[in-house]
């Protein structure tokens, strides 16, 4: 397979970077805005700090699965980043003050271990599965950001 894909999108939300960080870093709220991740809960650690682990349950029409993720960056009002499965996928949120609120950027990057895992488990079907996940991120990120904006600006 080619170089692992990455996707990012941004939106401006009429809230402070700190408020938005607090919302996003409370992973137990992820199901409020994600079209795929329906629930998250803390496994280890006491919340959004580097090294803490949490699990999530994802649902799409074809299947339901759980993941385990570790926080790798947590700077209030600046960035919140976690890696799924040890080293499979990197999800990140950055918060930049702008006129009218905060620009929130959500990013998603497939890491090399995910490519290896897909090739080992799916063989010739790996590229199709990767394309499926890329499309889910491509459509899911804007939907997540729009829902986050709606929830944040309604609070």
Where are these regions (language model features)?
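A generic helix-loop boundary/linker signal
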Residues: 10, 44, 61, 127-131, ...
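Residue-level detector of alpha-helix boundaries and kinks
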Residues: 5, 15, 56, 126, ...
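Short amphipathic alpha-helical segments with heptad-repeat character
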Residues: 14-17, 21, 131, 135-138, ...
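Glycine-rich portal/gate segments that line the openings of hydrophobic small-molecule binding cavities
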Residues: 41-90, 98-103, 139-155
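Hydrophobic ligand-binding cavity/cleft-lining segments
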Residues: 1-49
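Solvent-exposed residues in well-ordered beta-strands and their adjoining turns
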Residues: 12-16, 59-61, 96-98, 107-111, ...
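Beta-strand/loop substructures that line and gate deep hydrophobic ligand-binding cavities in soluble
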Residues: 83-139, 148
